[in-house]
C-alpha cells in the first residue's frame, strides 16, 4: 500500500487573515470594506441607542435654549430624536476630546456629529462591500450602483446640506418628528415642492412602488400550476429549479391587452433593469436637488406672476404655497430670529421685474 502525504503550505498569520476576510464561504461576507463598515456602523448604532434613551437637552440654535430629544427627558418614540449639533459649533469637527468636558460635549450636541459621520462612512463601506462581494462571485456590479441612491440621499441631508448652510445644526434630526420638522423647514426656506428634481424623485418613489406592485401581482397571477388546489402554490417551486416558475407570455398578453401592446415588456432582462433604474434615477435626482438647494439654488418662484389689466394680482397655487412657506418660516426657530429672512430684507425683492 502506498501512502501519499501532501505537504500543507505554511501561510503567515496575515495571509490567513486576508483569506478569511475575502472568503465567500463565510456565513456573512466581511471583505475589506467590511473591516471599516463593521466598527463604524456599530459605533453609530450604539451611540444612537444610548443618546436616544439618555442624552441631555442640546442647545441646537446656540442661544442657550436647550431642546430635549431623549426618552429620559420626556420624549416618546415619535417625538424623540438625536438633536443636531449646536449652531455654536457650526461646521467644526467636534469629537469628545475637543470639548472641555463630556457635559459640554453633550450640551453642544456632539453625539449627532459622531453618529452621522460614522453612519455615512458605514453605509458608503456597505455599498463598497456589495461591489466587492459581487466581484468575488463574478457577478455584475449593479447592486452597489442601485444602493448608491439611498447613500446619496443620506449624504445630501446629513452632510451636503449642513455644509451649504454653514452648520450641522441645519442637518436632519435623527428621529420621526425631527424628520418632519426638517421637511417643513426645508419647504419654507427652499420651496422644494417647486423644484423639478424633487418632482422627479416623487415620480421615482411612487412610480417604483406602482411598478413593483404591478410586477409582483402579474407574476403571482401567472404562476405555472405545479400543485393541487389543496396545496399552497408556493409549494410548486423548488429552489434552483431550471424551468420558469411563471408564464411571462401570459403576463405579457394580459398587460398588453389591459393597456396596449407596447406598454408591456417582452424581455425579462429589460423589464428588471427598468424596475431597478426607475426609482434609483429618481432618488439620484432628489439627492442632487437637496445638494443644490443646500447652496440656496431653490425651487421655482412663480409668486404673483399672474396679474389683471389693472395690475392687480390674481393668486395662483404658487401664491398659496408661498403664504404657507412664510407661515412655516416665521414659526420655526422663533426665538432665534425676529423675522424670517424674506421679511427682514431692507428692500422688498422684485417680483414682476
From Swiss-Prot:
<keyword id="KW-0359">Herbicide resistance</keyword>
<keyword id="KW-0812">Transmembrane</keyword>
<keyword id="KW-0106">Calcium</keyword>
<feature type="transmembrane region" description="Helical">
    <location>
        <begin position="118"/>
        <end position="133"/>
    </location>
</feature>
<feature type="binding site">
    <location>
        <position position="215"/>
    </location>
    <ligand>
        <name>Fe cation</name>
    </ligand>
</feature>
<keyword id="KW-0604">Photosystem II</keyword>
<feature type="site" description="Stabilizes free radical intermediate">
    <location>
        <position position="190"/>
    </location>
</feature>
<feature type="binding site">
    <location>
        <position position="344"/>
    </location>
    <ligand>
        <name>[CaMn4O5] cluster</name>
    </ligand>
</feature>
<keyword id="KW-0597">Phosphoprotein</keyword>
<dbReference type="GO" id="GO:0005506">
    <property type="term" value="F:iron ion binding"/>
</dbReference>
<keyword id="KW-0934">Plastid</keyword>
<dbReference type="GO" id="GO:0009535">
    <property type="term" value="C:chloroplast thylakoid membrane"/>
</dbReference>
<keyword id="KW-0602">Photosynthesis</keyword>
<dbReference type="InterPro" id="IPR055265">
    <property type="entry name" value="Photo_RC_L/M_CS"/>
</dbReference>
<comment type="function">
    <text>Photosystem II (PSII) is a light-driven water:plastoquinone oxidoreductase that uses light energy to abstract electrons from H(2)O, generating O(2) and a proton gradient subsequently used for ATP formation. It consists of a core antenna complex that captures photons, and an electron transfer chain that converts photonic excitation into a charge separation. The D1/D2 (PsbA/PsbD) reaction center heterodimer binds P680, the primary electron donor of PSII as well as several subsequent electron acceptors.</text>
</comment>
<dbReference type="Pfam" id="PF00124">
    <property type="entry name" value="Photo_RC"/>
</dbReference>
<feature type="binding site">
    <location>
        <begin position="264"/>
        <end position="265"/>
    </location>
    <ligand>
        <name>a quinone</name>
    </ligand>
</feature>
<dbReference type="InterPro" id="IPR000484">
    <property type="entry name" value="Photo_RC_L/M"/>
</dbReference>
<keyword id="KW-0813">Transport</keyword>
<feature type="site" description="Tyrosine radical intermediate">
    <location>
        <position position="161"/>
    </location>
</feature>
<keyword id="KW-0408">Iron</keyword>
<protein>
    <recommendedName>
        <fullName>Photosystem II protein D1</fullName>
        <ecNumber>1.10.3.9</ecNumber>
    </recommendedName>
</protein>
<feature type="binding site">
    <location>
        <position position="332"/>
    </location>
    <ligand>
        <name>[CaMn4O5] cluster</name>
    </ligand>
</feature>
<keyword id="KW-0472">Membrane</keyword>
<dbReference type="GO" id="GO:0009635">
    <property type="term" value="P:response to herbicide"/>
</dbReference>
<keyword id="KW-0157">Chromophore</keyword>
<feature type="binding site">
    <location>
        <position position="215"/>
    </location>
    <ligand>
        <name>a quinone</name>
    </ligand>
</feature>
<dbReference type="InterPro" id="IPR005867">
    <property type="entry name" value="PSII_D1"/>
</dbReference>
<feature type="transmembrane region" description="Helical">
    <location>
        <begin position="274"/>
        <end position="288"/>
    </location>
</feature>
<dbReference type="GO" id="GO:0009523">
    <property type="term" value="C:photosystem II"/>
</dbReference>
<dbReference type="GO" id="GO:0045156">
    <property type="term" value="F:electron transporter, transferring electrons within the cyclic electron transport pathway of photosynthesis activity"/>
</dbReference>
<keyword id="KW-0460">Magnesium</keyword>
<keyword id="KW-0793">Thylakoid</keyword>
<feature type="propeptide">
    <location>
        <begin position="345"/>
        <end position="353"/>
    </location>
</feature>
<feature type="site" description="Cleavage; by CTPA">
    <location>
        <begin position="344"/>
        <end position="345"/>
    </location>
</feature>
<dbReference type="GO" id="GO:0016168">
    <property type="term" value="F:chlorophyll binding"/>
</dbReference>
<keyword id="KW-1133">Transmembrane helix</keyword>
<dbReference type="GO" id="GO:0016682">
    <property type="term" value="F:oxidoreductase activity, acting on diphenols and related substances as donors, oxygen as acceptor"/>
</dbReference>
<dbReference type="InterPro" id="IPR036854">
    <property type="entry name" value="Photo_II_D1/D2_sf"/>
</dbReference>
<keyword id="KW-0007">Acetylation</keyword>
<keyword id="KW-0479">Metal-binding</keyword>
<feature type="binding site">
    <location>
        <position position="342"/>
    </location>
    <ligand>
        <name>[CaMn4O5] cluster</name>
    </ligand>
</feature>
